[in-house]
Curated annotation (Swiss-Prot):
GO terms for cellular component: cytoplasm; cytosol; nucleus; protein phosphatase type 1 complex. Interacts with Nop17l. Its cofactor is Mn(2+). Mn(2+) 2 binds at residues 90, 122, 171, 246. Binds 2 manganese ions per subunit. It catalyses: O-phospho-L-seryl-[protein] + H2O = L-seryl-[protein] + phosphate; O-phospho-L-threonyl-[protein] + H2O = L-threonyl-[protein] + phosphate. GO terms for molecular function: metal ion binding; protein serine/threonine phosphatase activity. The modification Phosphothreonine is found at residue 315. InterPro entries: Calcineurin-like_PHP_ApaH, Metallo-depent_PP-like, PP1_catalytic_subunit, Ser/Thr-sp_prot-phosphatase, STPPase_N. The gene is Pp1alpha-96A. It is an enzyme of class 3 (hydrolase). This is Serine/threonine-protein phosphatase alpha-1 isoform. The lineage of its organism: Eukaryota, Metazoa, Ecdysozoa, Arthropoda, Hexapoda. Belongs to the PPP phosphatase family. PP-1 subfamily.
Length: 327
């Protein structure tokens, strides 16, 4: 693979725009991007679908194509291999630089396979990113064929991680079908995200303070789950914390169920529509968790397309009144 692809050259070109005007594109060749997809796919399949990781590491939530904010996260937390990372999914869609975002993440995965980890989000799925921006970006800047190559790669991403046997991480949340970790390990890849069931729930479900047990999800997919479900899950599996993403939260992180679950969202000033901060959670060797906050940048400098006006509903912050279906 190294004959075809110089990974250091790719990373260095992707990082060249640091300090440039936000929004400046990095145009890798189509064959380089294809190689990133194929090589990372190989690595994903060689590692478990349920990762078992060790602290210290930094955990990040949704990025959604906000490439310059991803660079800010690395500036804050340390560019790999200075720190170990776990990302919780939703790399593409909504923001205008999904390609740079996913290419840098895949490049780091290839270069630092044992220290840099990516989970699958609900947007790493063809039926979703066909609609919410990634397909259009691939088609405009490259080809539809390249978008299909990304789909093949996304279908092999791991879906959950356990940090030091104590912190359970996934993109969305719990599932009424989940009773043993072995069920996650048995999910075969490559796989699309089904409309229901365990894999769907891990990527789509949401905690909800008004739900007792399991409830209907306003997204029109999966379920909501209450604090009691969280407590029972942690007790049964001897975990201390659930760490998930999937929802915009004002401060970049938000606790639920007496600090037994935390939501992380790492795209500040989401799509230029919200005033939310972004956050990254640092887990030290003793499993102490602390949060690094990215304040929303000056809106005039960060211009993201207003998808709200082109029929692509935004994910509302938790507690917002405007409830959108399937996001």
């Amino acid at each position: 693979m190294s004959d075809i692809m110089n990974i250091d050259s790719i990373i260095s070109r992707l990082l060249e725009v640091r300090g440039a005007r936000p929004g400046k594109n990095v145009q890798l060749s189509e064959s380089e991007i294809r190689s990133l997809c194929l090589k990372s796919r190989e690595i994903f399949l060689s590692q478990p679908i349920l990762l078992e990781l060790e602290a210290p590491l930094k955990i990040c939530g949704d990025i959604h194509g906000q490439y310059y904010d991803l660079l800010r996260l690395f500036e804050y937390g340390g560019f790999p291999p200075e720190s170990n990372y776990l990302f919780l999914g939703d790399y593409v869609d909504r923001g205008k630089q999904s390609l740079e975002t996913i290419c840098l993440l895949l490049a780091y995965k290839i270069k630092y396979a044992e220290n840099f980890f990516l989970l699958r989000g609900n947007h790493e799925c063809a039926s979703i990113n066909r609609i919410y921006g990634f397909y259009d970006e691939c088609k405009r800047r490259y080809t539809i064929k390249l978008w299909k190559t990304f789909t093949d790669c996304f279908n092999c991403l791991p879906v959950a991680a356990i940090v030091d046997e104590k912190i359970f991480c996934c993109h969305g949340g719990l599932s009424p079908d989940l009773s043993s970790m072995e069920q996650i390990r048995r999910i075969m890849r490559p796989t699309d995200v089904p409309d229901q069931g365990l894999l769907c729930d891990l990527l789509w479900s949401d905690p909800d303070k008004d739900t007792m047990g399991w409830g209907e999800n306003d997204r029109g997919v999966s379920f909501t789950f209450g604090a009691e479900v969280v407590g029972k899950f942690l007790q049964k599996h001897e975990f201390d914390l659930i760490c998930r993403a999937h929802q915009v939260v004002e401060d970049g992180y938000e606790f639920f169920a007496k600090r037994q679950l935390v939501t992380l969202f790492s795209a500040p000033n989401y799509c230029g529509e919200f005033d939310n901060a972004g956050a990254m959670m640092s887990v030290d060797d003793t499993l102490m968790c602390s949060f690094q906050i990215l304040k929303p940048a000056d809106k005039r400098r960060f211009v993201y397309p207003n998808f709200g006006s082109s029929g692509r509903p935004l994910t509302p912050p938790r507690g917002a009144n405007n409830k959108n279906k399937k996001k």
